[in-house]
């Protein structure tokens, strides 16, 4: 705590001053002006009457936070089989339900946006990311939910919505070494198979890790791959 020169604002009783990335709380005490640095958590608590409660978190939540874009969380999904609905893989079959193995996945939700990536190995902050071998996911890993709305849905509900939604012919390229033009052709060949061929995963270019992707999205640190809207 320190004494500083009186404020130029004669009527000021207290003030919160932004000093770089820190917060300086300043108040009058008699004829002097006192000040001290306070943490962002203290500022948040002072301006919010509502307690922060994540609610019950699903298993494999790796990280949670909040920022300018809203609440965010990172979920890891181990390798497993999924039953997914695909549209128009072939001209004569409008829809097809496939029981397929998928690699380990990272699902991230931030504000109203959701992202998904694949992993070759176990989850780790420094693990390199690969394109999720699924349609309806753009080059940054952002998921297109079509007309489905995410507002009011929990992280688990958003993940389940992604699995339950039909996968279309949109954004099917660049996600498989064996089938670079349409990853659905690879997925159809994996129906009832036990394991996903990890060698077929397409790495993100340039290479980026889980931690770098999360930092780019949550701290507004764009890089050559992940762009912050």
Locate the predicted segments by residue:
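Domain-scale recognition of soluble eukaryotic interaction modules
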Residues: 2-9, 125-229
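Compact alpha/beta protein-protein interaction domains typified by the UBC
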Residues: 4-10, 14-150
């Amino acid at each position: 705590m320190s004494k500083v020169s009186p404020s130029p604002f004669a009527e000021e009783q207290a003030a919160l001053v932004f000093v770089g990335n820190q917060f300086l709380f300043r108040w009058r005490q008699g004829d002097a002006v006192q000040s001290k640095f306070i943490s962002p958590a203290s500022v948040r608590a002072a301006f919010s009457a509502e307690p922060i409660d994540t609610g019950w978190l699903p298993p494999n939540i790796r990280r949670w936070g909040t920022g300018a874009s809203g609440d965010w969380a990172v979920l890891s999904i181990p390798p497993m089989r999924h039953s997914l609905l695909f549209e128009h893989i072939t001209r004569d079959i409008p829809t097809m339900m496939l029981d397929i193995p998928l690699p380990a996945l990272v699902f991230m939700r931030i504000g109203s946006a959701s992202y998904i990536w694949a992993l070759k190995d176990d989850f780790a902050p420094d693990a390199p990311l690969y394109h999720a071998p699924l349609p309806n996911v753009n080059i940054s890993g952002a998921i297109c939910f079509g007309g489905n709305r995410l507002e009011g849905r929990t992280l688990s509900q958003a993940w389940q919505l992604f699995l339950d939604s039909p996968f279309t012919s949109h954004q099917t390229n660049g996600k498989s070494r064996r089938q670079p033009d349409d990853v659905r052709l690879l997925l159809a060949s994996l129906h009832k198979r036990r394991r996903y061929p990890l060698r077929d995963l397409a790495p993100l270019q340039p290479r980026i890790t889980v931690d770098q992707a999360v930092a780019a999205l949550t701290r507004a640190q764009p890089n050559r791959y992940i762009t912050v809207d």
